[in-house]
């Protein structure tokens, strides 16, 4: 709970119980943000929000009518204000845990879940993805394709209360969340109906890395040459790299059946085996290992962590069975 003048530069001091961008969930003494989305314009639901108890309306378009006893705050961009206010309302939870964001066209889920699984051997971890949220015994389906900012900040706040120390997050929209480590997997021509061109798509992915402060880490895939060249000179944080074809801090050499390979970390070379299939999964594993370096794990612990890496259910998953043929389950993008 916050007072309205803690969230906005206003003279009023009434208490705010909750914040919403969906009028169906608005309750007494709440703020309703009129987000103008791709398919729904929140300005059309002001009447519903006020009827259900909203005490403040944040809007950006001209209004024909304003209800008495309701505070109306006009802003240039409602979504930007929602991202800012949600972070404040829930007491900046992402600054209180180690936040690891994973972005790219594919591999986000696999890398984020692998990191969560590995780090769970050392500290209490949480995970926020496109499918669900997991932390401290809580498993909840995510009702959005991309976790909506209020939903995400509320759960991050709950993680802090439950003493979670680190979070891996699949990143599509990142405003309002502070990241310590950002990982890039790959980029290809997806969602060009939204971004328009490959250049705009890469610029959208690159924004995350420019927001990491000097103490943080950007982890880039050197095999994605165009994106690497776009980002490497624009960041202000530490840079770590991984790759198979191009020189990097962490590399896989002499790959055998996409299961065994020589792991090169700087000048150290070790033969390792991981239970994953596919060349792309070797790249995912390298991203996970590089994140361990960013967390400044001792080298022996980094090598130990390789033994904790497991494949993700349904993602090039090899099923064990007694019959004379191979069964692989792969039901969606990686």
Label every PLM stretch briefly.
Residues 16-21, 53-60, 168-170, 217-221, ...:
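Short, hydrophobic beta-strand segments that form beta-sheet elements in well-ordered domains
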Residues 18, 137-141, 274:
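Short acidic, glycine/proline-rich loop/turn micro-motifs
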Residues 37, 189, 311:
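Short, conserved catalytic or interaction motifs in soluble domains
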Residues 1-84, 88, 277, 297-298:
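N-terminal leader/targeting and accessory segments in enzymes
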Residues 31-34, 58, 168-170, 183, ...:
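Structural motif
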Residues 13-14, 195-202, 206, 216, ...:
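Adenine nucleotide phosphate-binding catalytic loops in nucleotide-utilizing enzymes
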Residues 61-63, 130-131, 187, 244:
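Short, ordered loop/turn segments at secondary-structure junctions
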Residues 80-222, 226-236, 265, 286, ...:
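Phosphate-binding loop of NTP-binding sites
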């Amino acid at each position: 709970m916050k007072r309205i003048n803690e969230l906005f530069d206003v003279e009023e001091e009434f208490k705010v119980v909750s914040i919403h961008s969906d009028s169906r969930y608005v309750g007494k003494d709440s703020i309703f943000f009129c987000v103008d989305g791709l398919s729904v314009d929140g300005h059309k639901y002001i009447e519903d929000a006020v009827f259900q108890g909203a005490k403040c309306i944040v809007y950006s378009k001209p209004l024909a009518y304003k209800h008495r006893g309701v505070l109306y705050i006009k802003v240039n961009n409602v979504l930007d204000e929602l991202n800012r206010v949600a972070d404040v309302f829930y007491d900046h939870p992402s600054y209180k845990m180690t936040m690891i964001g994973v972005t790219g066209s594919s591999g986000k889920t696999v890398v984020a879940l692998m990191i969560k699984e590995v780090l769970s051997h050392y500290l209490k971890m949480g995970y926020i993805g496109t499918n669900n949220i997991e932390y401290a015994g809580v498993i909840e389906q995510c009702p959005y394709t991309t976790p909506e900012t209020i939903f995400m900040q509320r759960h991050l706040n709950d993680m802090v209360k439950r003493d979670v120390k680190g979070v891996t997050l699949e990143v599509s929209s990142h405003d309002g969340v502070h990241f310590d480590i950002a990982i890039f997997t790959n980029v290809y021509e997806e969602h060009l109906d939204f971004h328009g061109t490959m250049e705009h798509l890469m610029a959208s992915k690159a924004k995350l890395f420019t927001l990491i402060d000097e103490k943080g880490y950007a982890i880039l895939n050197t095999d994605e040459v165009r994106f690497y060249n776009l980002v490497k000179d624009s960041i202000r944080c530490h840079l770590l790299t991984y790759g198979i074809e191009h020189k990097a801090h962490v590399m896989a050499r002499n790959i055998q059946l996409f299961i065994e390979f020589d792991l090169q970390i700087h000048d150290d070379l070790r033969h390792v085996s991981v239970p994953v299939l596919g060349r792309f999964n070797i790249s995912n594993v390298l991203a996970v290992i590089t994140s361990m370096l960013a967390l400044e794990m001792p080298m022996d612990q980094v090598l130990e962590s390789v033994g904790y890496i497991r494949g993700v259910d349904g993602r090039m998953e090899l099923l064990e069975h007694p019959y004379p043929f191979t069964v692989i389950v792969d039901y969606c993008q990686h």
